[in-house]
Amino acid sequence: MYKQVFKKLKEIGQHTSDIECILIVGSVARGTNIMGSDLDIMIISSNKSFLVHDKSFIEYFGIVCNSKIECNGTCTSIRVWYQDENEIEFGIVDPSWISLTLDSGTKKVLTEGCIRSSLIRNMSFCFIIRLQNGIALIMVGIIYMDMCTAIFN
């Protein structure tokens, strides 16, 4: 269902210097999505304001029927409805979103919503590891947090 989207995310992650990493979160990442579930994508970018205001990247994923910007604290989301009936929510955050001190919302997303899905298992090419001492290793790419759940507790 989302195979082409994941392929395009990988291309964007590899070719866009402003994007530090891309996370698949929510029901698709957990493998609990049902028909009609949206795809939740977190984009950690050093140029958040450009991505939010330009928005042209959303057209890379299909023909846009409608889009809406939602502000949720440190995350600005662009919710997009595509002609193929897919709905994608792009959550765009600064690198500080995954800072040393996690707020409860960020912690919930990272522990419950970034779990490897069998749909995307073989598409990962980079990773993030947040150690208990607060050191974070962030690499460009799509990342999955299945092995990191215990670290965040």
PLM-predicted stretches and their roles:
Residues M1-L23:
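Helical scaffold of the NTase/Pol beta-like nucleotidyltransferase catalytic core
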Residues Y2, F50, E70-G73:
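Generic structural signal for well-ordered secondary structure
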Residues K7-K8, V25-V28, G73-T76:
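Short alpha-helical segments and helix-capping/turn motifs at coil-helix boundaries
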Residues G13-H15, G31-M35, R79-V80:
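Short secondary-structure boundary/capping segments within folded domains
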Residues D18, M35-S37, G73:
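Residue-level preference for short coil/turn positions at secondary-structure junctions
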Residues G26-G62, E85-G91:
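Catalytic metal-binding acidic patch
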Residues Y60-N153:
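Conserved NTP/Mg2+-binding pocket subregion across the NTase superfamily
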